[in-house]
Curated annotation (Swiss-Prot):
Compartment(s) where it occurs, according to its Swiss-Prot or TrEMBL record: Cytoplasm
UniProt keyword Cytoplasm present: yes
SUPFAM superfamilies, alphabetized: Ribonuclease H-like (SSF53098)
Entry's family note: Belongs to the YqgF nuclease family.
GO biological process terms held by the UniProt record: rRNA 5'-end processing
GO molecular function: nuclease activity
Catalytic activity, EC: 3.1.-.-
NCBIfam families tied to this protein: RNAse_H_YqgF
Keywords: Cytoplasm, Hydrolase, Nuclease, Ribosome biogenesis
Protein name: Putative pre-16S rRNA nuclease
Length: 158
């Protein structure tokens, strides 16, 4: 089920259970997961993209292995807030994934998440080679943490 906003996503989620954040690129999918109470996002892995069925199979294996209850996809908006071809591609991925899983799926604005991830890795004195290996999963962590913070805020205002 695709939830167009985090408020609807929050209503569709069970009270506890981990969720995943995804940073969809053309060559890779960065994956991060939360703890069961949805307080902290942790980078998990990178899926090398081939074709949708293989990508979805790898992702759904993570969903099953970790008993995830929802998915947050980074939505690459333009700096003016509009949606371009990359955002349309992300929405198409979500529609295709929706056919394969009953989990709620939502989007989170990913503007500057890769920049923030790169900055954090540089500050951590991570080598260029290592940065290239982990940047997508760290960016997924930033995307997921933003959504988790919003979910926590919504929980306080109910």
């Amino acid at each position: 089920m695709i939830c167009e906003n985090v408020e609807t996503f929050a209503e569709a989620l069970p009270r506890t259970g981990a969720v995943a954040g995804l940073d969809l690129g053309t060559k890779t999918i960065g994956v991060a997961v939360s703890d069961g109470l949805r307080g902290v996002a942790s980078p998990l892995t990178v899926i090398r993209r081939t074709k949708f069925t293989a990508d979805a199979q790898a992702l759904l294996k993570i969903v099953q292995d970790r008993a995830l209850v929802g998915l947050v996809l980074g939505l690459p908006r333009n700096m003016d807030g509009s949606e371009g071809p990359r955002a349309q591609s992300t929405r198409a991925f979500a529609r295709n994934l929706e056919r394969l899983t009953p989990l709620p799926i939502t989007f989170w604005d990913e503007r500057l998440s890769t920049v923030a991830a790169e900055r954090a890795l540089l500050e951590g004195d991570t080598s260029r080679k290592r940065r290239a290996e982990v940047i997508d999963q760290v960016a997924a962590g930033y995307i997921l943490q933003g959504a988790l913070d919003r979910l926590r805020f919504l929980g306080r205002t109910e």
